[in-house]
């Protein structure tokens, strides 16, 4: 069972594994509220995921460690598991969807893991990881629906409360729900008056639909530039914790996410991946009731492939009206281009 004590224990265990990312004020982001950023894009491995995987692996039995670990991931959990497993001298195998950014794939290998590329999206990688677990007797490290993983992610909530106890609202992206489950449990346990909001991509609203239906819902297809939250179905544990602790969930479009990524680059000199920028997008485009409030947006990661980043920047420029694309029909005869 997830408790505040477990999250505090995770914080103690992880103190020499992770770095504490200090909250920074994001001036010029929003005129109606005070925006602060919890920059987990500056975390070791470039993402919050190392917190959950690090704590989970630290709690394995010697027999479980000896079998080696296997995980599935859109990229960030992969790096967290690879780093933590290598730290504890454990063999690791990671299944990634074949659409995962090359930067995340290479980083996972560099942290010491063997990588298995799987056709499809996260859920396909998940199924392949389960198959290999059964075939080769690995210990499976779930990316979000595990209480030790959730407790590790919850250490972010403790750090926010230690650094900014007067915060009014905390905003997190939601894919499978591990991050917001841990953060919301910590925040609400320490101060139930603080609002906790979740943000999903419009093209991958699995938690939104699950809350509407009263049970975890599986979406047939998902599509978003925010690959870190491109999940077809939330976890059973995370679904229950979101119902219990999270005040509301909103969705943002890929154009809005692109604009938030661009805003972070220009105003904060900070690189965020799509999932990391989603909370800021929700604030920027007035999706949340935070006028006049102190708001912490968790920038969950910064592992965005440079080729994707260039397209996202262009999309953000188009969204904000700073770049235009024109289509002109010309007759196929000499002199037409000169005339234009």
Tell me what each language-model feature is.
Residues 1-340:
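PLP-dependent amino-acid enzyme catalytic core
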